[in-house]
């Protein structure tokens, strides 16, 4: 399994590959050596950050909290954005979410100028202290594992406000 920036929470670049004992044994048995850890990899500072980050994730139960508490809370709040007239669909797994912007709910129609609505929303969001990414007319969010319920409420309230502004702008 490959992994990357999440192992350091993005503070420093690091990536890697994890293999099972079965896989590593097959490599060692056939090749005699499992070659890894070259001079251009395994940077000590990045590895130290990864070790500390993993310790914090474990000590503060952030993965369990995301799965059992804040994730479901955010998913429920995020789903409420589907009540907005320009939101066709929301979806979320864990803390990664997307929201599709459409000119008319329950219609297969899309905005004529693809990505204008997305960028309009994104610009309103950034100007109001909310960082989200526009991918065409889909808005993507991925808040940190340490987000609180109060911050989730603020995120969704600001998203709704930005949807209102976007709707107003797109209907001019």
Q: Where are the language model's segments positioned?
A:
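Conserved N-terminal phosphate-binding loop of PLP-dependent enzymes in the Aspartate aminotransferase
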Residues: 1-172
């Amino acid at each position: 399994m490959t992994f990357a920036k999440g192992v350091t929470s993005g503070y420093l670049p690091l990536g890697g590959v994890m293999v099972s004992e079965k896989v590593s044994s097959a490599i060692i048995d056939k090749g005699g050596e499992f070659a890894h850890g070259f001079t251009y990899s395994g940077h000590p500072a990045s590895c130290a950050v990864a070790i500390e980050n993993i310790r914090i994730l474990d000590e503060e139960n952030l993965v369990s909290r995301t799965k059992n508490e804040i994730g479901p809370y955010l998913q429920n709040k995020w789903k409420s954005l589907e009540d907005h007239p320009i939101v066709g669909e929301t979806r979320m797994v864990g803390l990664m979410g997307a929201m599709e912007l459409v000119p008319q709910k329950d219609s297969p129609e899309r905005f004529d100028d693809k990505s204008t609505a997305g960028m309009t929303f994104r610009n309103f969001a950034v100007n109001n202290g909310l960082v989200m990414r526009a991918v065409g007319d889909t808005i993507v969010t991925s808040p940190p594992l340490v987000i609180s319920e109060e911050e989730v409420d603020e995120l969704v309230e600001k998203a709704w406000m930005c949807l209102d502004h976007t709707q107003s702008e797109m209907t001019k």
